[in-house]
């Protein structure tokens, strides 16, 4: 299978645009060389994805940090000339010869994660999430409307079968959602919107809102987003800083879903996701935290970066901090175990809280 001449021309146009954009510093621009374009512009995956599907978001959004997405699982292998160097640079030197370790969620280690902030002075809330792709389905740009609906039906059956009192709850499909339910989910910060301009340009919003929905338990501490950026985002959260409790609930919920729906895993890259930044463990362990003193210092970002922590505003990626509250998470997802990813966040935050106390 070969990409059409029109697609190949569009790929060359994206390359030319990126090279001429002095204000663009994405990993796509850096690693989409003339040689990579020449070698890969005619290739097509079995599901019909081309290099254009991989690069179009970064070509349209010159302020992207990374700029590439995988339209299907095969893309990670077929377009490895581009994915491998981007993955290596983003994921802390994870080379093309490296392999993601076997899964270790940390069942035996949960007890080591004592509450980071028992007095409740700093941490507003704690959240751990992971992404999963259902085996046998492509990612967003290659999904048909039928695919979306089939995946949603499968997940509804799983949700309806949950008997664990901590996890059982209700599934809310986005299709046909009434205003009252919508308002309630927005108030709880559970409702995800149509993808932003980065995802839109990557063709991740097709057939919206079909096949999309949200499941949450009665206590609103366990959530599953269906067909947002990834097929599944499995989330455990609660107020305060008890990371151990949050992780234990995530493990229980993830194991429950995994027993009934096999997930797509790559022998080298681990759990597969639409965006290469989430590969491997896919784990993002985060807190909303008040750090008014050290966040005012010039080297705050460097302190976090040195501890492999990522800072965002509390309204997610590409948002600013409000009232000195930051969303701080582990940056590394690949080349370490799931438990190590959580531990990276935990140990870094312990240190940040010590620094904040010392600055008082």
UniProtKB/Swiss-Prot annotation:
InterPro entries: ATP-guanido_PTrfase, ATP-guanido_PTrfase_AS, ATP-guanido_PTrfase_cat, ATP-guanido_PTrfase_N, ATP-guanido_PTrfase_N_sf, Gln_synth/guanido_kin_cat_dom. The keyword Endoplasmic reticulum does not apply. The keyword Ubl conjugation does not apply. GO terms for molecular function: arginine kinase activity; ATP binding; creatine kinase activity; kinase activity. It holds the Pfam family ATP-gua_Ptrans. It comes from the Eukaryota. One of its GO terms (biological process) is phosphocreatine biosynthetic process. Substrate binds at residues 65-69, 229, 275, 317. ATP binds at residues 125-129, 189, 233, 284-288, 312-317, 327. One of its GO terms (cellular component) is extracellular space. PROSITE patterns: PHOSPHAGEN_KINASE, PHOSPHAGEN_KINASE_C, PHOSPHAGEN_KINASE_N. Keywords: ATP-binding, Kinase, Nucleotide-binding, Transferase. Residues 122-359 form the Phosphagen kinase C-terminal domain. It catalyses: L-arginine + ATP = N(omega)-phospho-L-arginine + ADP + H(+). Residues 10-92 form the Phosphagen kinase N-terminal domain. Its EC number is 2.7.3.3. Belongs to the ATP:guanido phosphotransferase family. This is Probable arginine kinase ZC434.8. The lineage of its organism: Eukaryota, Metazoa, Ecdysozoa, Nematoda, Chromadorea.
């Amino acid at each position: 299978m070969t990409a059409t001449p029109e697609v190949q021309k569009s790929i060359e146009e994206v390359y030319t645009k990126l090279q001429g954009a002095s204000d663009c510093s994405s990993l796509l621009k850096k690693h989409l060389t003339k040689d990579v374009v020449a070698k890969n512009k005619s290739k097509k995956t079995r599901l019909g994805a081309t290099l254009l599907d991989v690069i179009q978001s970064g070509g349209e959004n010159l302020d992207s940090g990374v700029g590439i997405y995988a339209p299907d699982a095969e893309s990670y292998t077929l377009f490895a000339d581009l994915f491998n160097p981007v993955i290596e640079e983003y994921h802390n030197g994870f080379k093309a010869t490296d392999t993601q370790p076997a899964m270790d969620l940390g069942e035996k280690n949960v007890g080591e994660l004592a509450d980071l902030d028992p007095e409740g002075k700093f941490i507003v809330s704690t959240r751990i999430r992971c992404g999963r792709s259902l085996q046998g389905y492509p990612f967003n740009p290659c999904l048909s409307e039928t695919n979306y609906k089939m995946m949603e039906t499968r997940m509804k059956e799983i949700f309806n079968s949950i008997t664990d009192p901590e996890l059982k709850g209700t599934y809310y499909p986005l299709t046909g959602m009434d205003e009252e339910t919508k308002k309630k989910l927005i108030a709880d910060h559970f409702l995800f919107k149509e993808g932003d301009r980065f995802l839109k340009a990557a063709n991740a919003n097709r057939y919206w809102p079909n096949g999309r929905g949200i499941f949450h338990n009665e206590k609103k501490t366990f959530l599953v987003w269906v067909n947002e950026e990834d097929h599944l985002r499995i989330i455990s959260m609660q107020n305060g800083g008890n990371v151990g409790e949050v992780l234990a609930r995530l493990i229980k919920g993830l194991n429950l879903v995994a027993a009934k729906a096999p997930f797509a895993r790559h022998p080298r890259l681990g759990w597969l996701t639409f965006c290469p930044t989430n590969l491997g463990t896919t784990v993002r362990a985060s807190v909303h935290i008040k750090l008014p003193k050290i966040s005012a210092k010039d080297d705050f970002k460097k302190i976090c970066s040195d501890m492999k922590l990522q800072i965002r505003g509390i309204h997610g990626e590409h948002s600013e901090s409000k009232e000195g509250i930051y969303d701080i998470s582990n940056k590394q997802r690949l080349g370490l175990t799931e438990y190590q990813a959580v531990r990276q966040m935990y140990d870094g935050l312990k240190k940040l809280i010590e620094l904040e106390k010392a600055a008082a």
